[in-house]
Regions:
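Mixed-charge interfacial surface used for oligomerization/domain docking
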Residues: 229-324
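Active-site cofactor/cluster-binding pocket
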Residues: 117-186
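Gly/His-enriched, cation/cofactor- and phosphate-binding structural elements
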Residues: 38-69, 97-99, 281-435
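Anionic-ligand anchoring segments at beta-strand to alpha-helix junctions in alpha/beta enzyme folds, i.e.
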Residues: 68-131
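Divalent metal-coordination and catalytic microenvironments
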Residues: 78, 88, 137, 164, ...
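Helix-enriched interaction subdomains in cytosolic or periplasmic regions
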Residues: 11-51
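Short glycine-rich or small-residue beta-strand-to-loop segments that form or flank ligand, phosphate
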Residues: 69-75, 224-226, 289-290
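Short alpha-helices
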Residues: 161, 165-246, 250, 355-357, ...
């Protein structure tokens, strides 16, 4: 019997509980010999979730065996999503899946293309390339498909396994109900880790698939941990550190990882950066840069520019605004260390900024431990942009078109500053130290 055809209880949650919590003794026994008793005791919470995932997948082994599986990442795949997918692919293969496909729409960063090429990861188009009637899984992002960072993917109503450290379970539950999702059979959303790859690596350790994926697969998972925690500097947990160390312990894996970290950027990236710094608005500790038009293959430069702006001394909120083939995109990075002891305040400010300026099309994540670091973004599809401000098809061609797109980004930048200034007037305590 296919898992996707098991009906959920009427009126029950969409995100199905993954089963009863395993006892502490059981968790200690399973992980004590793999990770050490002291480490297991100190990290019993997240390791309990790993064991729940293991037990849940074993429980559905008969349904997996002989069945095709789709693993969806964000539309634009990143190392954490791809590393997680490689590990989950091996786990599902161990459980007898007939075919497992990793579905990613594009690779926006040169490092991602380098990863796919060197680790020989085979990717499929999320719509045409999916297995019909396959079990649907998601890693490093959450249902429903067709929203947020999976915007171009056609939606489905049933999901088998989801692992994501970004989203809040309540938000995902609400979004799934709003978009007609019936059930997520094994839901691990809001994982307390710095990278989804760390969670999947620990799960892969229980399934004993590390040797199966070889040095390239271990390096892919290691790179996922490395990049999503900014070289293990921002937001890593003890599990991230331990999994990265164990994954890269052998020389072969370490050599592959070195090759993955050594990549080159196309000249266009530096042009975008120059434009951004030339068109930057600064108000106190807030910086907003207009980037202009960015090709789909270079989309990751938007987030990278926001991260670079945050490194400027005295900056608490850094934002980059660009136009892509998807729409008008905004990337935000923020750090609460300049706000005194009230670190949580930066989260409230970014939440207000994104939801007020881009209602219904934004999302963000943040570190839950002070000092809070925030990453956020929003994308207004072209249909909405045309209704509100401009027509892309009439303005993209030639220098005049490029200037029109840049001016559009400047107008968004000015609007974001205005939103913060309005917030300062309405709730001055929240913006103290920012403007």
């Amino acid at each position: 019997v296919s898992v996707t055809r098991v009906r959920a209880r009427k009126g029950g949650p969409v995100l199905q509980p993954p089963g009863r919590l395993p006892g502490l003794r059981r968790v200690s026994t399973r992980f004590g010999r793999l990770l050490g008793k002291r480490f297991t005791h100190k990290n019993i919470g997240v390791l309990t979730e790993v064991l729940r995932a293991y037990v849940g997948l074993r429980r559905f082994e008969k349904s997996i065996r002989g069945h095709g599986v789709n693993i969806f990442t964000q539309w634009v795949g990143d190392p954490d999503a791809l590393g997680s997918a490689v590990m989950l692919q091996a786990i599902l293969g161990e459980l007898g899946a007939s075919e497992v496909r990793i579905l990613t729409g594009s690779l926006g960063h040169p490092q991602n293309r380098n990863l796919v090429e060197k680790c020989r990861i085979r990717l499929f188009e999320p719509n045409a390339g999916r297995i019909p009637d396959g079990l649907n899984c998601m890693v490093d992002t959450s249902p429903p498909l067709g929203t947020a960072n999976t915007g171009r993917a056609e939606p489905v109503t049933d999901y088998f396994f989801v692992a994501d450290h970004h989203a809040d379970p309540e938000d995902v539950e609400r979004a799934c109900r709003d978009h007609g999702v019936k059930r997520v059979q094994l839901a691990f959303v809001g994982l307390p880790v710095g990278s989804t790859s760390a969670f999947l690596a620990a799960l892969g350790l229980l399934f004993d698939v590390w040797e199966t994926i070889g040095p390239a697969g271990r390096a892919a998972a290691g790179l996922g941990i490395y990049t999503d925690t900014s070289a293990l500097l921002h937001g890593p947990t003890a599990l991230d550190f331990r999994m990265f160390e164990k994954l890269t312990r052998d020389d072969d894996t370490s050599d592959v990882l070195d090759e993955l970290r050594d990549y080159r950027l196309p000249p266009e990236w530096f042009i975008h950066r120059a434009v951004a710094f030339q068109n930057m608005l600064t108000r106190g500790a807030v910086r907003v840069a207009a980037v202009g038009y960015v090709r789909d293959a270079e989309r990751d430069v938007i987030a990278e520019i926001a991260s670079e702006l945050l490194r400027i001394e005295g900056t608490s909120i850094a934002t980059a605004v660009a136009v892509t083939d998807l729409g008008t995109e905004v990337s935000i990075r923020a750090d609460s260390r300049l706000l005194g002891r009230d670190h949580q305040r930066i989260v409230d400010v970014i939440d207000h900024l994104l939801e007020y300026a881009f209602p219904g099309v934004s999302g963000f994540k943040y570190e839950r431990r002070p000092p809070h670091r925030v990453e956020g973004g929003a994308c207004i599809p072209h249909e909405q942009s045309e209704e509100l401000m401009w027509r892309l098809g009439a303005t993209r061609g030639g220098p005049d078109g490029q200037e029109a797109l840049l001016e559009h980004c400047r107008s968004i930048a000015r609007a974001l500053i205005a939103v913060l200034e309005d917030l300062k007037f309405a709730r001055p305590a929240e913006t103290a130290g920012l403007l």
